[in-house]
């Protein structure tokens, strides 16, 4: 593309290409709504990020014809999706909540033998594998154009339209966009939300023994992990000790993991090198083990936040721009996908003259309530595991240590059942009182 300024018109412009933005582009593309999507990143997610696709989201993917493709991605079909707890990965196993591998999940769900009865089972897959599928599907619609490597520098909301300016990374190309609606899908630090003056309300970085305050994420490759630590594979691996609490999700079932640990007060994340990141992992293992660090960064756990507003006249926010979770229960990414499904058909109907302003307003009414509900559940899960503190001598090879480990394992497995077996939470959101629902007598 030649250097210069290009003026483009679109019914909808989406700022951000994560799960919410890409899913919304698909929902609009299915309804032939002209849509431009821009994201400052050069492509879809590299780091693992979200690691669980709930059953409702899998049902949406089934409707789009991609459920089987998604289920074939990520970990091998026979890889255990257990939740396992250890003092350290190479030391004592405290307990394990067994869950079916993806090859057995749907058959089990459809047998009506367990707690899940649905057309699709949950699937343990990293967001990094889901996003490319969503991008490809969105780009298949003639009415949708996806642009990665473009940063929004400004936007202005008018009475009947919204304008926005995007600059391409490392070029002199600018797009001046005129759209009927602008969607803020630009994540936790949303420029769109901030310019609208909307506030995130709730708990910021709530401190806990684990899953509260500063955490550190390490994306690593360690194919010999289970051989070295001498344990059976699991999807989610937790350590429970007073020195290096951590969780680690299997990413591909072949040796890539997403490792997260609570930083101690004496640890300065600014000084963490690749080698120190590897040491954090080794401390959680409790044995000497080699690994390749692919990336590492700090993040804050303990958020339970929902924006006070989701919509203005011509600008709408969703996904992480509208709500922030501590990633317990796998609710954040899945809530974002549901935001997109809810908003997509409503935007299309209004743009086609089949609905009025009230239909758009129902998006805020419905999805804000669900966000408050879901962040509350996630906070409860984080409290349950994060405020459960290891007893002294838990790691001791003594009779007392064995008793302490038995009690801890019992508690943690019961916690896992509450956090990772949640059909009621997955399917139980309600839109009572929504303006699009017929009123009934109390």
Regions found by a protein language model. Give the residues of each.
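Glycine-rich FAD pyrophosphate-binding loop
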Residues: 29-49
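Conserved FAD-binding catalytic core of PHBH/FMO-like flavoproteins
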Residues: 136, 181, 185-299
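Active-site-adjacent segment of FAD-dependent monooxygenases/related oxidoreductases
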Residues: 46-137, 240, 375
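Beta1/beta-strand and adjacent pyrophosphate-binding region of the FAD-binding site
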Residues: 4-20
